[in-house]
Amino acid sequence: MKSGVARLGYLGHTVADMAAIDTIFGDVLGMQRREVAGSQEVMYRMDGRHHRFVFSPAKSDQLSFIGWEVDSLQALRAVVERLKNSGKEVTKASPDLCLLRSVFEMYRCTGPDGVPLEIYFGGVDD
């Protein structure tokens, strides 16, 4: 059984011009826009997954997190163990954050460039 990251799951960005995001991702690329209840965040999907992109309004454009998917809980725990053994601080995501990202279980750490990495299992297809 594979015990590493299987695929890129989603990307999170802060953006200064949310209208431009709607134009590019919705009108030009034809992705489906999804609202986030109680938030200014907007998600876009391009396939069967709940979302692949998360955009939050901000004063500047910046990559804000990267979601990496694994194929099993066993693989998730193996990745987390390897990260911890390499000296990375890894924290388990709250149930609320897992619900927001539409994943079953997730852990977070910071990548070498300072961007938060989210390693998860159980992305929602809908």
Language-model segment annotations:
Residues 1, 7-16, 58-126:
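Vicinal oxygen chelate
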Residues 1-4, 46, 59, 100:
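Generic structural signal for beta-strand residues in well-ordered domains
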Residues 3-51:
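Core segments of cupin and vicinal oxygen chelate
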Residues 31-64, 109, 115-123:
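Conserved short beta-strand elements that form part of the metal-binding/catalytic scaffold
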Residues 38-39, 68-70, 78-82, 92-93, ...:
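Glycine-rich loops and low-complexity Gly/Arg-rich segments
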Residues 47-50, 69-70, 96, 101:
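Non-heme Fe(II)-dependent double-stranded beta-helix
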